[in-house]
């Protein structure tokens, strides 16, 4: 299982949120470039970067910093936050970003997601952010009436290769991932699934790995020391 250390960017700094609440922001590193380099030096093989400013503004805001992070880390990066157009995807991929995450637009503009997948294939991941099983949009500010399972099935029909599933109610809480929902997703679709939200320990990563998932994202638990980079490396290797 691929494990992605997470770096969330706000105002040029590396931050963590609690349940996606922008008012509950904690700065974990003022230098995201150094953070990316540190993760890679400690064994990270792929980074997950979210442009929170971009998610709010609906356009890439921190691309220059993200480019510097990739250059410093020398590992692949996937980036999400505010990606709403083909021009923005072109912008990221031509700048050396390895995979782009389409979030809210996957629900609000399915034609856009389909066009992106048709053009870029595996370089596109679709994000599903949900609360109590219902899909959220616009930086998690709006909750729809669409089931996460239904949206995943629609994405599979569009030939999406990778879905990143975030349980908002668990994100940044260290309460453990929603194993029931991830298991349901794994049964419902056959594409690559990446779990995000709530990972609090090495045992959580091992439990996700046992579900047969393609990947998992670790954020807050890495920053507060609940999970070490050596834990990540060992779980990744044992899962193959």
Curated annotation (Swiss-Prot):
Catalysis performed (reactions): 1-(5-phospho-beta-D-ribosyl)-5-[(5-phospho-beta-D-ribosylamino)methylideneamino]imidazole-4-carboxamide = 5-[(5-phospho-1-deoxy-D-ribulos-1-ylimino)methylamino]-1-(5-phospho-beta-D-ribosyl)imidazole-4-carboxamide
Pathway it works in: Amino-acid biosynthesis; L-histidine biosynthesis; L-histidine from 5-phospho-alpha-D-ribose 1-diphosphate: step 4/9
One GO process term, biological-process aspect: L-histidine biosynthetic process
Upper classification of the organism: Bacteria, Bacillati, Bacillota, Bacilli, Bacillales
Pfam families per UniProt: His_biosynth
Enzyme class: isomerase
Main localization (coarse): cytoplasm
Keywords: Amino-acid biosynthesis, Cytoplasm, Histidine biosynthesis, Isomerase
Active site, renumbered: 8, 129
GO molecular function: 1-(5-phosphoribosyl)-5-[(5-phosphoribosylamino)methylideneamino]imidazole-4-carboxamide isomerase activity
Organism: Listeria innocua serovar 6a (strain ATCC BAA-680 / CLIP 11262)
Gene designation: hisA
Domain of life, source organism: Bacteria
Family of this protein: Belongs to the HisA/HisF family.
HAMAP family on file: HisA
Localization in the cell: Cytoplasm
EC code: 5.3.1.16
GO cellular component: cytoplasm
NCBIfam families (UniProt xref): 1-(5-phosphoribosyl)-5-[(5-phosphoribosylamino)methylideneamino]imidazole-4-carboxamide isomerase (TIGR00007)
Name this protein carries in UniProt: 1-(5-phosphoribosyl)-5-[(5-phosphoribosylamino)methylideneamino] imidazole-4-carboxamide isomerase
């Amino acid at each position: 299982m691929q494990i992605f250390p997470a770096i969330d960017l706000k105002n040029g700094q590396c931050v963590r949120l609690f349940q996606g609440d922008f008012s509950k922001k904690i700065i974990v590193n003022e230098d995201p470039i150094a953070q990316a380099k540190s993760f890679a030096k400690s064994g990270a093989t792929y980074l997950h970067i979210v442009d929170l400013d971009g998610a709010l503004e609906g356009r890439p805001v921190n691309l220059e910093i993200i480019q510097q992070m990739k250059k410093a880390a020398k590992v692949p990066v996937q980036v999400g936050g505010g990606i709403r157009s083909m021009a923005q995807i072109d912008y990221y991929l031509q700048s050396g970003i390895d995979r782009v995450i389409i979030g809210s637009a996957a629900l609000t503009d399915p034609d856009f997601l389909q066009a992106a997948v048709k053009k870029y294939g595996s370089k596109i991941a679709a994000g599903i952010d949900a609360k109590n099983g219902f899909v959220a949009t616009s930086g998690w500010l709006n909750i729809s009436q669409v089931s996460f399972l239904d949206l995943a099935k629609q994405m599979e029909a569009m030939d999406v290769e990778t879905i990143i599933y975030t349980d908002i109610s668990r994100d940044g809480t260290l309460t453990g991932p929603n194993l029931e929902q991830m298991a349901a997703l794994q049964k419902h679709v056959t594409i690559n699934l990446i779990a995000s939200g709530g990972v609090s320990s090495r045992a959580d990563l091992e439990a996700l790995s046992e579900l047969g998932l393609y990947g998992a994202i670790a954020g807050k638990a890495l920053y507060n020391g609940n999970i070490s980079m050596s834990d990540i490396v060992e779980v990744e290797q044992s899962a193959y």
